[in-house]
Amino acid sequence: MLILKNVTAVQLHPAKVQEGVDIAIENDVIVAIGDALTQRYPDASFKEMHGRIVMPGIVCSHNHFYSGLSRGIMANIAPCPDFISTLKNLWWRLDRALDEESLYYSGLICSLEAIKSGCTSVIDHHASPAYIGGSLSTLRDAFLKVGLRAMTCFETTDRNNGIKELQEGVEENIRFARLIDEAKKATSEPYLVEAHIGAHAPFTVPDAGLEMLREAVKATGRGLHIHAAEDLYDVSYSHHWYGKDLLARLAQFDLIDSKTLVAHGLYLSKDDITLLNQRDAFLVHNARSNMNNHVGYNHHLSDIRNLALGTDGIGSDMFEEMKFAFFKHRDAGGPLWPDSFAKALTNGNELMSRNFGAKFGLLEAGYKADLTICDYNSPTPLLADNIAGHIAFGMGSGSVHSVMVNGVMVYEDRQFNFDCDSIYAQARKAAASMWRRMDALA
């Protein structure tokens, strides 16, 4: 048993602040929180926290780790006047240039930086059309190396190679889900990685692909992870070719349920939002990505039952993401305040609970010991009623001191327990090679 002694225990939702308490952890689970636990458990080891903030682990609920080597990209990118041209000229060339090495180092770098930013878990959405089979296992290797809890999937699409590409994407999703099932039975590795069934977006998945995805969801017991209504084009395409709203079309194939994760959703219809809520599915808002891609703003956030936050590939700094989500909402005239976005941030843990079959997101006995530990010397009182305001206007990822995942300190006193410099050096080489491959693509 390990006791984190003298902590400031903070929950964002339901909001709660307890100063000077201890947290007792047995294996990967919290067993007690309260005063003087070292007296109750005299044989336990302990770490003195000196009043540091300890909160339930932070989750990035939608990310693209395959884009980790795109920072400062020097490949020749044609002008991108709109969202679709941005996809075609940048992202759909980058993902075609990925190979096993570049994907592995992209996964490593993104995992390292997620943890340094305070994330204990990331929900990833992957694409590498030239390297489909085995790609999700490569990402899993990166997650396990660093100690990050994660979910991933392959974004099924027909955009490069038609029905063959659809089949290969679905097969990789199924293969990976079954690999996870076998790994859980073997218990030789920590259960840190789970699977979704992935799809790119409705406008690149025909009905034949949705039927394949329905069968994959049914066969594996996993939920769908898909972009939808990120841009008006997706909605117009669905109306023109299928005569249906986006989520209504997905629901026709039994793809909207309590494990479904829909990213973006800026232009979902009122009926689609009702459907999403009735099926208890999740919408993940990616404020900075929407701003960067100039796709518009989601004016319906207050109507969403299960709202979570993600980055869509712009790092994994969820402190920053929550700030932008709130500020952009205010700029757009929205009605929500910081506490609503703090709740959305914590909702990522509900996604973990639904998919890992365990309890995440509270500092209570029986919950997973996934914890974010911060140095934050507040200049004003830190209270349950104002903790969301402290994050919106002050506390950031620079305060992250340590991160615990599954009861293990994977990042302690701002250090990993392995050499990171060599990983970054190799990542730079892999990035340069990938950029050259991008330039060689038509």
Swiss-Prot record:
Record-level GO BP terms: negative regulation of cell growth
Enzyme Commission numbers on file: 3.-.-.-
Protein's UniProt keywords contain Zinc: yes
Keyword rRNA-binding: no
EC class name: hydrolase
InterPro entries in the record: Amidohydro-rel (IPR006680), Aminohydrolase_SsnA (IPR017700), Metal-dep_hydrolase_composite (IPR011059), Metal_Hydrolase (IPR032466), MTA/SAH_deaminase (IPR050287)
UniProt keywords, alphabetically: Hydrolase, Metal-binding, Zinc
NCBIfam families in UniProt: PRK07203.1, Se_ssnA
Full protein name: Putative aminohydrolase SsnA
